[in-house]
Regions:
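Active-site and adjacent substrate-binding regions of carbohydrate-active enzymes
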Residues: 1-528, 532-555
Length: 555
């Protein structure tokens, strides 16, 4: 297998609005990130992915961009960005930009022009259609509830927005749009950024006839309906030729709705398109087929089957990304394990062991390395996320699919705002994130869970992440070894091996609060511990795995 620096990297995702406020306005900013470079270096990560920092009206927290070559005023200036980039590079950390080019803001100059008239030179930068029988052109739904079409009175036509109505979709079939995007990407690469995380990149190519899809719980087809369209690979290969080959970059595509076969095309090892993709099949294990708003618990057997499918399916063909969390997902320790005081630390360490020991590039979302948890929201007024607020309005107030109590329960479990509360730096007011009340509430458990408390505690979740990250840098087998699942039918234990030549590792993770008896394969019984989240017990044929225990044995 060919060795690459991006396969050996550990990526840390920063959601700038919630990371560190340096100027006392309650909003995180670029200078706050610069301030914390030593913390990131201490953790051991070597790539930072920044959620969008471009100029934006902030309808969807920066994923609605009005100027790709300017910095959001709340986050600082371009000089602040340059200073942060230089500081990152001084600390041995590469910077990856969030590239949002499926859509722009409706306040972007291209769209302002596009909606003026049917013959405007920018009209074809976006996707406009006539209505059908007095309604939308098709039954596609927006990711954020309601239809994916907005009627525009100025020209009497509808424009497509797979996300909010303030995020009109770009028309990638127009070569001028592609040239504009590629030119902008080259501009950022010349500035010195090291790569791109590509937002919903699997959606950029729509089928020309825009066919109806299967309706979901709210009567609309999924926003994923256009995923993996007819020209998506052609456009990404063009991007590779005109942009990505100009620098030694890391690229990861967010590919909602991607299949294993499609992923092989996006992230083949011949590097004609992307280095890797984010797939979300494992994130859907605790959702219903047409509805994520549920408090359904994860079935570990299904989770193992999905992760194993991706581990084995991409082996020697493409590269996996490894993650439990990001800015769109709730906190993993609350979602998949036990965030109670009794089991919080071992749970967070177990989840980290399970995902970091697989083949692929691991992604750590800010606060995950502390075991930050979901938030005990009590009112819809505490939410800031468009997705959550719109879903509550649509499913409770308009369609009466759920009661207010049910929906609050689902939001507390699944809302994106669980990941977006301020980073918990210390136990001072507002968790040391800001000197004033932040843009969104602080999780009340910040006095127990914070960076200051953990950084100097050798037994903390933070220092366990440091060990895992150091091991990955030290041992090639963790990066390049092949993966094989054991005990597929166990409802509590996730056990797998990694193999590279004569070397072999055994990874054992208990996803339950039960003690579970497990037989250790013979070849590991005379082995040694590589890492463990409990005091190490004697290695023998039959071992009792303690609640949320995780360990790795080396042959």
């Amino acid at each position: 297998m060919e060795k690459k620096w991006w396969k050996e990297s550990i990526v840390y995702q920063i959601y700038p609005r919630s990371f560190k406020d340096s100027n006392g306005d309650g909003i995180g900013d670029l200078n706050g990130i610069t301030e914390k470079m030593e913390y990131l270096e201490k953790l051991g990560v070597n790539v930072v992915w920044l959620s969008p920092v471009y100029q934006s009206p902030n309808d969807d927290n920066g994923y609605d961009i009005s100027d790709y070559r300017a910095i959001m005023t709340e986050f600082g200036t371009m000089e602040d960005f340059d200073r942060m980039l230089a500081a990152a590079h001084e600390h041995g950390i590469k910077i990856v930009m969030d590239l949002v080019v499926n859509h722009t803001s409706d306040e972007h100059p291209w769209f302002v022009e596009s909606r003026k008239s049917k013959d405007n030179p920018y009209r074809d930068y976006y996707i406009w259609r006539e209505g059908k029988d007095g309604k939308e052109p098709n039954n596609w739904g927006s990711c954020f509830s309601g239809p994916a079409w907005e009627y525009d009175e100025e020209t009497g036509m509808y424009y497509l927005h797979l996300f909010s109505k303030k995020q009109p979709d770009l028309n990638w079939d127009n070569p001028k749009v592609r040239e504009e995007v590629f030119d902008m990407m080259n501009w950022w690469l010349k500035k010195g950024v090291d790569g791109f995380r590509m937002d919903v990149i699997s959606l950029i190519s729509k089928k020309p006839d825009l066919p109806d899809g299967k309706p979901g719980i709210n009567g609309y087809a999924s926003f994923n309906e256009p995923a993996n369209g007819p020209h998506v690979h052609e456009y990404l290969q063009e991007m590779r030729e005109k942009v990505l080959n100009n620098a030694d970059t890391i690229t990861v595509g967010e590919c909602s709705g991607v299949t294993l076969e499609e992923a092989k095309k996006y992230a083949r090892s011949d590097e004609k398109e992307l280095n890797m993709v984010f797939q979300f099949e494992h994130m859907d294990v605790d959702a219903d087929a047409d509805n994520k708003w549920t408090d359904k618990k994860m079935d570990l057997r299904e989770m193992k089957a999905v992760l194993t499918k991706w581990q084995k399916g991409l082996e020697d063909i493409a590269w996996n990304s490894l993650f439990w969390e990001n800015h769109d997902q709730p906190r993993s320790v609350s979602r998949y394990a036990d965030d109670s005081a009794k089991y919080h630390d071992v749970s967070a360490k177990m989840l980290a062991t399970c995902i970091h020991m697989m083949q692929g590039t691991p992604y750590v979302y800010q606060g995950e390395e502390l075991g930050m948890t979901n938030v005990p929201f009590t009112s819809i007024d505490q939410f800031r996320d468009l997705d959550s607020i719109n879903a509550y309005r649509e499913l409770v107030e308009e369609q009466h699919v759920f009661t207010a109590e049910e929906m609050m329960r689902y939001l507390c479990r699944k809302s994106r705002d669980n990941a977006r509360t301020p980073f918990q730096w210390d136990d001072s007011a507002y968790a040391g994130f800001s000197t004033v009340e932040p843009w969104i509430m602080v999780n009340p458990n910040y006095k127990e869970i914070n960076a200051k408390k953990q950084v100097d505690d050798p037994e903390s979740v933070f220092n366990y992440y440091r060990k895992l990250i150091a091991l990955r840098k030290e041992k090639e087998i963790i990066v390049y070894g092949t993966y094989d699942l054991l005990l597929p039918e166990s409802e509590e234990i996730y056990m797998y091996t990694r193999t590279l030549g004569e070397e072999k590792l055994l990874v054992v993770c208990n996803f339950s609060e039960k003690e579970v008896a497990v037989e250790i394969p013979e070849e590991f019984r005379k082995g040694s511990y590589l890492i463990a989240n409990y005091p190490e017990g004697e290695i023998k044929e039959q071992m009792t795995i303690r609640p949320y225990e995780a360990f790795v044995l080396e042959k």
